[in-house]
Amino acid sequence: PEVFKSELEECKKMASTKNIDLKSFVFPGHTIGNIDHLAGLGFTSYRSNFVNTLGYPVQRPDKLWEHKSTVEFDIRPNWSMKYHVYRYKKIVDRAIKNRTNCHFWFHPSMPNQFLTDIMPALFEHIDKRRDEIWPTTMGEYTNWLNQNHSI
């Protein structure tokens, strides 16, 4: 825990020099641990669950919010670009139908082809359904939860 805490304290210090306040956390490589220390370090949420869930965030007793991921933006080699677009749109539609969260995530190193061939069609679909869905960030959603939910 001491290495975890000291590394995060240094990250927060470096981020603050750029006027960035780190509040949400993603565990590297899905190696989840030391969760009990996140709230004490000023974090308000973390992303967990790499089993693709359409669900809801859960608040821990320490007020830290756990956001379950739905799917990673990535290129599946056996799928056509058209099928990728179809699948991602279907995930959004299922979240709307079932009134659940849809938590997309990606690595900055994702293939450029995703940015050019999939994201525009998916974001257009989300925009068309904007009256049924709230496109937001994990930080904005956590702030909303903290203002509108009590444990």
Where are these regions (language model features)?
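Alpha-helix N-cap and loop-to-helix initiation/capping positions
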Residues: 2-6, 80-83, 114, 118
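C-terminal domain-boundary segment and adjacent tail
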Residues: 45-50, 88-151
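An active-site-proximal "capping" alpha-helix that borders the catalytic cofactor pocket
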Residues: 4-18
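Active-site-adjacent pocket scaffolds in enzyme catalytic domains
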Residues: 17-100, 129, 148-149
